[in-house]
Amino acid sequence: MDRRSRTPQGQIAQVLVEFLEVAVSCIVFLKGFYPPRAFERRRYMNVVVQKAVHPELASYIHSTTTGLLPFIQKGLVERVVVIFYDKEHVPIEKFVFKLSVNQSYGSKLEEADLEFALRAFLIKLTVAEPVTKSLPSDGSWEVTAYFRSLPSYGDREAQLWIPTDAKLWMQAPHITPIKSVSCDPLKMQLYLEHPSPTEPKNPAA
């Protein structure tokens, strides 16, 4: 379906999943999780970004972000989180995209305004390294989505998502805001979460 023939919610969902695919790639590059040759400099929304080109890495990022399309369109997705773990699978850093798509918005979507707003997120990501934490060499990472309500059990796309087994922090996390935007029909925040300095060493499962 041509993007212009979609509802505003469908249009914004398509733009968002394309943006999230690039943003996740930039985050993973920023953290130095893979050799630089796994990425390639590209221009997206007139910003130079690092796009994953390693086949397995690129496929994982693409499938997880595009898999969110129908749920973002329906307003079901509350947060998309890139979580980095230590070897015990305990989260040590989270990049959180908290989003809300106005389901009653019926006006024509100005994609130029939306892309201008999203471009600012990518620019912020390129300079976010000083507020991040170094990662252990034996760690791991994943993309996790948090839903406002669960999709229907018979939803074929929903069956591609499985519950996460990530351990939880016992204390409220330390939050570092990176960027926020309110551009109807989209509201989105990007922030970092780190464990509290008083966090117990063995979080609950």
Where are these regions (language model features)?
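Long protein-protein interaction modules used by eukaryotic assembly/scaffold proteins
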Residues: 1-59, 64-205
